[in-house]
């Protein structure tokens, strides 16, 4: 559930926020400021990192105290590895904002083209081992797959970085790729 909540909030909100600025014309005003493109991107995405971390802490609190789910691992490690997951969701959100022109398109594209397939291919609903081999290969490109393993490892097994490093490395690689691609497309749309 945590992976889906963060995917929903931290992917859809930034994409809609950037597209809204395109729609109302404030993005053009921001472009003429002396900010470097990377500064603009960080400024646009930083609030959503904070929102994602607040969501993480709220969901963890609800899981522990309302539903009695034990947190056997490190909360600090969970927060740090969640930052890697947020890198992925923010990259996707920024990428979506470069592909669409309206907020409605951003929401629909994010929900139906990205989010639904990612959830089905992550192993959250159907075990990856039960999927056809070709689809199993595709799941290696799905960030939710790795974050779900991280959540299960930290919450249920008390796993540390010694066990979770392959998932963390995958999130870092995919997230860097997504954010780089999205930043390049965003810069081209600014030029």
Predicted regions and their residues:
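Transmembrane helix boundary and interhelical loop/hinge segments in multi-pass membrane proteins
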Residues: 11-35, 191
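Hydrophobic transmembrane alpha-helices and immediately adjacent juxtamembrane helices
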Residues: 7, 32, 38, 182-188
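Selective transmembrane-helix segments that form parts of the transport pathway or gating/packing helices
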Residues: 35-62, 79, 83, 168, ...
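Long, hydrophobic alpha-helical segments
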Residues: 1-14
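Conserved hydrophobic/aromatic pocket- or pore-lining residues that grip, position, or stack substrates
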Residues: 2, 18, 30, 34, ...
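Juxtamembrane helix-boundary/capping and inter-helix hinge elements in multi-pass membrane proteins
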Residues: 32-38, 101, 160
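Membrane-spanning alpha-helical segments of multipass transporters and channels
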Residues: 60, 70-191
């Amino acid at each position: 559930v945590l992976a889906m909540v963060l995917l929903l909030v931290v992917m859809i909100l930034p994409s809609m926020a950037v597209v809204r600025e395109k729609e109302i014309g404030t993005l053009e005003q921001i472009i003429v400021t002396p900010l470097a493109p990377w500064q603009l991107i960080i400024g646009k995405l930083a609030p959503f990192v904070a929102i994602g971390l607040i969501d993480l802490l709220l969901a963890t609190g609800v899981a522990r105290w309302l539903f009695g789910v034990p947190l056997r691992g490190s909360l600090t490690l969970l927060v740090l590895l969640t930052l890697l997951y947020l890198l992925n969701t923010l990259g996707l959100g920024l990428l979506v904002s470069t592909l669409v022109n309206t907020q409605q398109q951003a929401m629909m594209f994010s929900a139906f083209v990205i989010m639904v397939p990612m959830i089905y291919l992550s192993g959250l609903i159907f075990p990856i081992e039960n999927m056809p081999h070709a689809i199993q290969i595709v799941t290696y490109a799905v960030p939710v797959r790795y974050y779900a393993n991280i959540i299960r490892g930290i919450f249920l097994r008390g796993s540390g970085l010694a066990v979770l490093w392959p998932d963390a490395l995958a999130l870092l690689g995919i997230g860097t790729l997504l954010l780089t691609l999205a930043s390049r497309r965003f810069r081209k749309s600014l030029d």
